[in-house]
Each structure stands twice: as structure tokens, then as C-alpha cells.
């Protein structure tokens, strides 16, 4: 794939980026070089190579899934503007 000045202007328009004619002419060879590198990557033989997300093996450390109330009710309710009987007190919305 080859990029020309019209394509650069179209991309700039879609991205809402203001570019001058000088910028457009400078971007054409740069974008063509980038696309050339991408084409080279597409030529690499990756048959038999397993996909991976990281270079080093990562093991996710999980904690036991235990239900708990946190035992910090009083600290949480201290942040509330109003609390009654261990719950948040809110004004009545529906009559």
C-alpha cells in the first residue's frame, strides 16, 4: 500500500488535524516507510509460535474469595452526612 498527499490530507481531515502543505509532503515518505515496516512484519513466518501476552511467565496471584462486611461500618458511616441505626439516612424521594 502506498500513501500519497491526498491520503494524508484525508487522514488529517478525519482526525481533525490541521496540516500545512509542507507537513503533508514530509509525512508522505514517513508514512510509506511505516507501512513498509508493517509489510515486513507480515512476511515473518510465525507458524508454530504460540501467541503470548508477555515475554515472561506471569501468574496471577489470587486471594481467597471470602464474603466479608469489612468490619469497618463505623468508619464508613462516619463519612455520611446522616446515619441512623447503622445505615445511611437519606431524604424521602417518593411519597
Swiss-Prot record:
EC number: 6.3.5.-
Cleavable signal peptide: none
Keyword Protein biosynthesis: yes
GO molecular function: asparaginyl-tRNA synthase (glutamine-hydrolyzing) activity; ATP binding; glutaminyl-tRNA synthase (glutamine-hydrolyzing) activity
InterPro entries tied to this protein: Asp/Glu-ADT_sf_sub_c (IPR036113), GatC (IPR003837)
Disulfide bond annotation, renumbered to this chain: none
Enzyme class name: ligase
Catalytic activity: L-glutamyl-tRNA(Gln) + L-glutamine + ATP + H2O = L-glutaminyl-tRNA(Gln) + L-glutamate + ADP + phosphate + H(+); L-aspartyl-tRNA(Asn) + L-glutamine + ATP + H2O = L-asparaginyl-tRNA(Asn) + L-glutamate + ADP + phosphate + 2 H(+)
GO biological process, one term: glutaminyl-tRNAGln biosynthesis via transamidation
Keywords: ATP-binding, Ligase, Nucleotide-binding, Protein biosynthesis
Similarity-based family: Belongs to the GatC family.
Subunit structure: Heterotrimer of A, B and C subunits.
Alphabetized NCBIfam families for the sequence: gatC
Function: Allows the formation of correctly charged Asn-tRNA(Asn) or Gln-tRNA(Gln) through the transamidation of misacylated Asp-tRNA(Asn) or Glu-tRNA(Gln) in organisms which lack either or both of asparaginyl-tRNA or glutaminyl-tRNA synthetases. The reaction takes place in the presence of glutamine and ATP through an activated phospho-Asp-tRNA(Asn) or phospho-Glu-tRNA(Gln).
Name of the protein this chain belongs to: Aspartyl/glutamyl-tRNA(Asn/Gln) amidotransferase subunit C
Organism whose genome encodes this protein: Rhizorhabdus wittichii (strain DSM 6014 / CCUG 31198 / JCM 15750 / NBRC 105917 / EY 4224 / RW1) (Sphingomonas wittichii)
Lineage of the organism: Bacteria, Pseudomonadati, Pseudomonadota, Alphaproteobacteria, Sphingomonadales
Amino acid at each position: 500500500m502506498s500513501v500519497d498527499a491526498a491520503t494524508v490530507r484525508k487522514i488529517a481531515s478525519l482526525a481533525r488535524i490541521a496540516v500545512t502543505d509542507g507537513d503533508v509532503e514530509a509525512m508522505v515518505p514517513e508514512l510509506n516507510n511505516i507501512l513498509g515496516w508493517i509489510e515486513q512484519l507480515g512476511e515473518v513466518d510465525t507458524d508454530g509460535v504460540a501467541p503470548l501476552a508477555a515475554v515472561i511467565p506471569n501468574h496471577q496471584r489470587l486471594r481467597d474469595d471470602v464474603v466479608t462486611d469489612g468490619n469497618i461500618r463505623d468508619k464508613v458511616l462516619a463519612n455520611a452526612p446522616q446515619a441512623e441505626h447503622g445505615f445511611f439516612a437519606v431524604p424521602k424521594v417518593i411519597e
